[in-house]
Amino acid sequence: MDSLQKQDLRRPKIHGAVQASPYQPPTLASLQRLLWVRQAATLNHIDEVWPSLFLGDAYAARDKSKLIQLGITHVVNAAAGKFQVDTGAKFYRGMSLEYYGIEADDNPFFDLSVYFLPVARYIRAALSVPQGRVLVHCAMGVSRSATLVLAFLMICENMTLVEAIQTVQAHRNICPNSGFLRQLQVLDNRLGRETGRF
């Protein structure tokens, strides 16, 4: 990851005078335990998990009136394609929103990590627009789309993987598959080395 470009995406994190213990990258088992602790009280089709950033399912993505009501300006479909959630630019024709589609499988062997930086850039740019509001979705809104939102928070908001999971889980229950969790672990380790967290 090009550090100059990555730095353009990050917001500075303010640290207090007290030095915390060094960050310990989480194991896969500890991440899965963290995800099993359900924090969100209800199951919704769409939830705001970060200011102006929404995580949702296929139903939410197809509910044009709800998207208009929420003021969604950008949609990231992590389950694009004819045999998945087949929305797209044509589906949203006549609406003032931008569309970004990724043909990703919810499969532990699918490499979603190649999309981490491009999607983070897209979300950051969309949120930088006045009144920019982004929906990231897949079929169920718990694995593919959640993984991309977690990566965004790690890359652009300088969160650890654990912090990102806790942030999202406070608003929506998520469950990235084990392969996606491993890819997020790799990102967490790489960002940790680059930022000196450990």
UniProtKB/Swiss-Prot annotation:
Describe, from its UniProt entry, the tissues in which this protein is expressed. Answer: Highly expressed in the testis (at protein level). Also found in the skeletal muscle.
One GO CC term on file: cytoplasm
Q: Where is the active site?
A: C138 (phosphocysteine intermediate)
Chemical reaction(s) catalysed: O-phospho-L-tyrosyl-[protein] + H2O = L-tyrosyl-[protein] + phosphate; O-phospho-L-seryl-[protein] + H2O = L-seryl-[protein] + phosphate; O-phospho-L-threonyl-[protein] + H2O = L-threonyl-[protein] + phosphate
A GO term for molecular function:
protein tyrosine phosphatase activity
Annotated InterPro entries: Atypical_DUSP_subfamA, Dual-sp_phosphatase_cat-dom, Prot-tyrosine_phosphatase-like, Tyr_Pase_AS, Tyr_Pase_dom, TYR_PHOSPHATASE_DUAL_dom
Q: What class of enzyme is it?
A: hydrolase
As recorded in UniProt, its EC number(s) are 3.1.3.16, 3.1.3.48
**One of the GO biological process terms:** negative regulation of MAPK cascade
Q: Where is the Tyrosine-protein phosphatase domain?
A: 45-193
Coiled coil regions, renumbered to chain:
none
* UniProt superkingdom: Eukaryota
Give the record's keywords alphabetically.
Hydrolase, Protein phosphatase
Tell me the function of this protein. Answer: Dual specificity phosphatase that dephosphorylates MAPK8/JNK and MAPK14/p38, but not MAPK1/ERK2, in vitro. Exhibits intrinsic phosphatase activity towards both phospho-seryl/threonyl and -tyrosyl residues, with similar specific activities in vitro.
Q: Which family does the UniProt entry place this protein in?
A: Belongs to the protein-tyrosine phosphatase family. Non-receptor class dual specificity subfamily.
- In Swiss-Prot or TrEMBL terms, this protein is called Dual specificity protein phosphatase 13B
Q: What is the lineage of its organism?
A: Eukaryota, Metazoa, Chordata, Craniata, Vertebrata
Instruction: Identify the coding gene.
Output: DUSP13B
